[in-house]
Amino acid sequence: MYKRQVSEQCFYGSSGYGYGDMGRETLDKVYAQAFGTEDALVRHNFVSGTHALSTALWGVLRSGDTMVSVTGAPYDTLEEVIGIAGTKGSGSLIDYGVKYKQVDLMSDGKPDLDKIALEISDAKVAYIQRSRGYSLRPALSLSLIHI
């Protein structure tokens, strides 16, 4: 945090538009550095995990791109965002031309690495859901999903 010069000023309010908001930009850089990522988006406005995930998916995927869920079905609430459930034409990723594939877990609850290798060759996003969500399967360990 000292390297990025985080100070009390980073937490002051702004105009709301975010133009030149030193605090937002600084905290994004701190999170990116802490998690070893290219970039980060840190906002108090995300109201749920589905909101955060859908923002990330909409930010990355475009018409013609493919998303592959490599750990079976996603969260129930994410199914409508993707377009595999809910009303057609309501503005899902599929409605906007994103292709969706799914690789189910094997009977022992582990990812099917052979099928995953086949399906992700043309994918823009390989979606890994570690949490069991509302399903009855156990959560996946980090060692199990580290590919």
Ranges and model annotations:
Residues 1-5, 145-147:
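Conserved small/polar residues in nucleotide/adenosyl-binding loops
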Residues 3-37:
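Glycine-rich phosphate-binding segment of PLP-dependent enzymes
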Residues 15-23, 41-48, 108, 137-140:
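Catalytic cores of large soluble enzymes that bind and process phosphate-bearing ligands
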Residues 40-67, 74-85:
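Conserved beta-loop-alpha segment that forms the PLP phosphate-binding cup at the N-terminus of a helix
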Residues 42, 69, 102-104:
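Structural signal for conserved beta-strand scaffold positions within catalytic alpha/beta enzyme cores
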Residues 76-79, 84-143:
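PLP-dependent aminotransferase-class I/II
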